[in-house]
């Protein structure tokens, strides 16, 4: 039997695997990836023996740091990061929720200073707990739960 790859291999870069279906676009925003400047291979809602369905994001030519990759845990807590060199996986690790999240989440409190258009203040959230995953706004102390994070990601 001949097996064909649906998504081509990359020579050097980062592969984010085991992403919940439909999360690849949000992850691109979290990582501040500009698809007009980066070669990307995005597979959305593909079959997975582990998850049933999943997304895969291949970022060619860019090795994500562990700190960058850990931001992915906000929407994909079981994601796997594969660092690829010379078409082979050189490193592999699971993401972990970051201690601090800056700039790309919006505070749900409409009265928070970060939501005042006259004040150019970026959001800063500090992790309060891992299970359940919760973050607290540094400015207004509002808590953000894991189930709220996806809807609070700022559009690019």
From Swiss-Prot:
Cofactor(s), names only, from the UniProt record: Zn(2+)
Gene3D superfamilies reported in the protein's UniProt record: Aspartate carbamoyltransferase regulatory subunit, C-terminal domain, Aspartate carbamoyltransferase regulatory subunit, N-terminal domain
Cited InterPro entries: Asp_carbamoyltransf_reg_N, Asp_carbamoylTrfase_reg, Asp_carbamoyltrfase_reg_C, Asp_carbatrfase_reg_C_sf, Asp_carbatrfase_reg_N_sf
Binding site for Zn(2+): 107, 112, 137, 140
Source organism superkingdom: Archaea
Subunit structure comment from the entry: Contains catalytic and regulatory chains.
UniProt-recorded name of the protein: Aspartate carbamoyltransferase regulatory chain
């Amino acid at each position: 039997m001949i097996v064909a790859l649906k998504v081509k291999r990359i020579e050097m870069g980062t592969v984010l695997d085991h992403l919940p279906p439909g999360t690849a676009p949000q992850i691109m925003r979290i990582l501040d990836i500009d698809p007009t400047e980066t070669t990307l291979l995005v597979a959305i809602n593909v079959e997975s023996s582990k998850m049933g369905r999943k997304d895969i994001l291949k970022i060619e030519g860019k090795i994500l740091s562990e700190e960058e990759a850990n931001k992915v845990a906000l929407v994909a807590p079981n994601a796997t990061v594969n660092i690829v060199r010379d078409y082979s996986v050189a490193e592999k690790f699971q993401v972990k929720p970051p201690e601090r999240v800056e700039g790309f989440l919006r505070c749900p409190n409409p009265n928070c200073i970060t939501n005042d258009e006259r004040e150019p203040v970026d959001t800063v959230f500090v992790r309060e707990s891992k299970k359940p995953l919760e973050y607290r706004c540094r400015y207004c102390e509002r808590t953000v739960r894991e189930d709220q994070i996806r809807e609070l990601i700022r559009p690019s």
